């Protein structure tokens, strides 16, 4: 939804709420109806239809009042593109029993279809769009059907705990975003899940129903694979499009759960983390209102309530509500600075993660300028607001902020944000302290090895090499092979070399650990066998029969930025790229070299799949420290796999930028001779 247009209609509501009306409707309802134009007749049909049913009448009022600012983008070319794309994707044979392999296969096929329709219709992000406002287009029949179907779910025993307000917010809504409206989605899913009503007759636990539906969703919907495409799609996906596509980013996962579960009377919310506190971007997922009126988060087709993992550090977690807060004009002016629709969100951070309050002391020199303070997090490029507070007695208090995050308090003046004070570390235990640059006690020598932290998925790639063995033999079958080296600890993200006692052999190989038992893809970026001269040995590529020279070359090419994967797939028609070895059943996996004759092996080297955020010799880097703003500490050329800076101010935040290439960069501190990421 376009936030600015949403804001403008909210202002209209604010104004109208103070206008006395001689209408038979409430001021807010009249304000909405007055925006409906000729479609007012359709909306009033709904109100007249429910004149004798007080609850359904109130539900109709709730929907109409909160239609303001809700719409679908319109463009005939996009309709044609969507029809061709989703019909083609809907015809794909997608298997759901092995998610990782199938996501990979589906992505290849879907990307081909997407690129084909883009070539035909052009880039949809560059189309000119019209707008179909719900108030001016939704029919009486559509709303009446939606309301009646939603109320029918109140016969289920697991809805007995719901208040009318929660029912309206989390069961009744007919849409979740800007998607084209779909007829009969509630009926479709109620028919699909009518067996649940029989099997759980008398069960009052909504979480039990949620688990069953979520399990079913996992049989026809992949919880990944669509992010690259959908982030370039200008409007939300309809129910029909989601059912055809069957792959997703986290937003589409949340949408599928809303449609499927609300159709069965479950109070399910769309949760959002607009910005992570320790990396770029954000995240979307779901939560269900339990019979104890607590939120239990989950991820559609992936994690049930009680199993979901919030993998990064959220400063704020919000529930998207269908209703919107009534706000004063001053409040509306304040929230203009957020890049998400703050007025439609409810803060649930403390329900899902540990939080602490943060108090900001406003310097005397700024007290006359600062009436509102924004608490900001770093999104890898700039500081973005995630919360705000009014100044009272020279202080601003922020409640229930996520921990283990660096926050920068700022105020807005003359079109830009300005710092109120130093960044604030909110530690894991809730303790707080400022980040203050100390030039009087500098870090005498700072050694930097990365510009971005290693996240869980990166550590996962590294873990896939643990247990691997480097072996040598005098025969190509590796009978009586000698193990030269075993990886027994988590590898770093760069190329590491280890000396061994010299061993003479002709054939050498990298023997994977049992990746199939672990359920991973055995990602490897680079390996090497070191000779007497300290350089990697060369030879003819050898390996299991499923490997070929193109596969094997990937890990012997001296480039740590590409990588080799191993997949198990029985799909003999699948076409995999050259950096993938495909086997049809679990077996020992190995790749190696025929050295052409006996050679001394004096060491091994290896690097796991990584994100290319290491230090590289061909790149130029610039280090900055925060001291009232980012201050450059000079540029350096990469020296093998590290950079060295001397006499650097201590106690503050740093950021390292690659001036040659790349885009990811992250805040860090320097503690006990190491980079600590925030």
Predicted features along the sequence, with ranges:
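Short beta-strand-plus-loop segments that form exposed binding edges in beta-rich domains
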Residues: 511-518, 657-663
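Extracellular beta-sheet/turn segments enriched in Thr/Pro/Gly and aliphatic residues
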Residues: 339-351, 422-450, 674-678
